[in-house]
Amino acid sequence: DDQIRANADSNWSLDKDASTFVTNQLLLKRDIDWNSTFFKTGVWGTDLTGVASGVGAGEFLQWNDSASDPIVQFASLQTDFVEQSGRKANTLVLGARTITALKNHPDIIDRIKYTQRGVVTTDLLASLFDVERILVSYATVGSGAEINDAADQDAGTTYSFMSDSKSALLCYTPSSPSLMTPAAGYTFTWNGYLAGNGYGIRMKRFRM
């Protein structure tokens, strides 16, 4: 509003900050939609569940257990993926606690201990799991009623990871997307039909 603009050190910076804030909120909404729609069971062809013990059909030993073998498991999943789809999985999406468990797994640490840095990174994990890239979901969201008091608002807000932090998604995403190229999913924008940038966002200024 006019008071905030009058108190700003630079009007140009204020416009930029406002645009960045609104854009981030829109992208956050897109992340929320993706997580609630796709980063869950019942959507993809194969669902596996990590268990603490007594592994049965469709289950595996949780990766925070030193007796588990995520490297062999991913190799098997990759083979199954190629057999069922004709394409090699190249993208692995991990929850925040999943990446922590994998980085501290003794088998993985043993495999990379003679590398240049001896530190488990997402690049090294990608090589071990034979994928091109690993994406980690660290986004968080706050939930709670809006309260017109900073202290009460903070006390009444609960923060959590947007994604299931103990989940993983192995999928195929092409480097050159198109309507005729299969992929785990697409988000298209209709260029020339609606104004906006590549994310389908456009900016408009108005007085408040």
Named regions from a protein language model:
Residues 14, 56-69, 109-208:
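Sequence/fold signature of self-assembling virion shell proteins
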Residues 2-88, 96-111:
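Alpha-helical scaffold segments that mediate packing/assembly in large oligomeric complexes
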Residues 88-91, 166-168:
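Short, surface-exposed beta-edge/turn micro-motifs
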Residues 91-95, 135-137:
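A structural signal for short, well-ordered beta-strand segments and their strand-loop junctions
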